Amino acid sequence: MSGQNQGNCEETYSTSTHEYANADSTDWFADMFADFEPQNTTDGSYRGTMAKIKATELQYQAVFEQKLVEANTNLKRERIRVSIKQTGNSLQLRATLPLKPGDGSLGKTKKQYDLSLGIPANLEGLKTAIEESYELGKLIARHTFEWNEKYLGIKSREKQEIKTIGELLDKFEEKYYQTRQKTITSQNTFPNYISVIKRNFPLTHLATKENFEEIINSVQGNKKNELIAVTSVFIKTFNLGFQLDVKRDNVTPAHREIPEDDKIIYSFDLFEKFALNRKNTNISDEIDTWEMWRWVYGMLATFGLRPRELFVQPDINWWMSPQNLDHTWKVNKNTKTGYREVIPFVPEWIELFDLKNPKPLKILEKKVTKIASVQNINWMRRDISRWFRKVGIEFQPYDLRHACAIRAHLQGIPIKAAADNLGHTVDEHTKTYQRWFGIENRKKAFGEVISQKSLIELQKNEILALRMENERLRLEVEKLKFSTTKNPEDCEQLYHQG
């Protein structure tokens, strides 16, 4: 290569390396999910959540593969004699280099090698691989390449020193969002991951399979299952190279009394009773707040919504629109299971609970405009439970949702329609109403079936009686016809006399 050409080549390498080295790493991830809308495969169940995670991972992998192709195309176009290849969970640099020390290939002075530098196969790793490709290309162009610890893989092995859980935790959020959308849902989920790890694992312990499993196996039930789920995400995020060898516990949900309709209606009035009997408050924002929480209660009871589905960008304009003839509530796409339009399970409660009253809706709108983060939404969600306790309601907010699932079953609403309305899969919906289907609801179901059978029997008897009456009348008509045919003169005489 001439000195002039070599100089141009070096200038190309220098500029490109500088561009990649100084590029903000967030640029690599900013548009990854710009047009990505995963199908609403999650209903909050483990299977549904995993389906959505899988869809997101496939999107990430597609973007990664596209960027890898682009990187190799750019390297080739700029005549850099290095390419990048993926092997398992790592990226390697492929180049034709002088023979490695100890390589006895006869009759050769050069050979194609795949260099392992300890670079992970993700977008951040690809950025590093591109930088290393330009650096290696520069050495090849200058004929100054030498086999050293870095290219022999010695340093990469040293780099694989196991870090503590605390060291990884400091980088957890950054790594987590490199492969996931930053949505309201994910921002709500992630702080819980951090909290679970901090509460349960000594941060000074090494992030090894044995250390994780020792803690997980020391607890039972829901806590164990939560640790398995969170730790699995943690391990996968950092590609620690192992999987947990622990089994989830089978947990039987605690018994819950799902409220009957009369109790739901009675409890609605507890909000106003509380407001009338409470001590005076000088905080103007809190004087009428009870009306908004009563409205929230009514909506949960009527529609079977998740509490968050009332607070995440509520479409109040649609709710109050004259065009909303079916009184549906539109759940925002940024909620747990995505967009859906919900039909009221008990339409008459819209009027009974005065759910179209603009006053509580204005309070809600004012509250929602103050929401600056996911944390604010969580505060509002927790406030519902606090208000239930404050006014003396004896059940939990989610029990109203379970009541809708049971009610739909008793009403004979097709399972698929009810599941879609609640944002469930059919399986999850069936589990829900079967789990909380108590003795009173069984009595009601039996009573309705028996009542329907009694009604059918009554209708059958009525039909039989009508048929017998019809037969009697038919015979009377036939008898009359017969007597008329037998004595026509008598009939004529009777006619003239009349």
Curated annotation (Swiss-Prot):
Keyword Cell inner membrane set for record = no
**Which ranges carry the Tyr recombinase domain?**
263-446
Please report the organism this UniProt entry assigns to the protein: Nostoc sp. (strain PCC 7120 / SAG 25.82 / UTEX 2576)
Q: Which GO terms describe its biological process?
A: DNA integration; DNA recombination; DNA repair; heterocyst development
Name this protein carries in UniProt: Excisase C
Q: Which GO terms describe its molecular function?
A: DNA binding
The UniProt keywords, alphabetically, are: DNA excision, DNA recombination, Heterocyst
Q: In this record, what's one Pfam family?
A: Phage_integrase
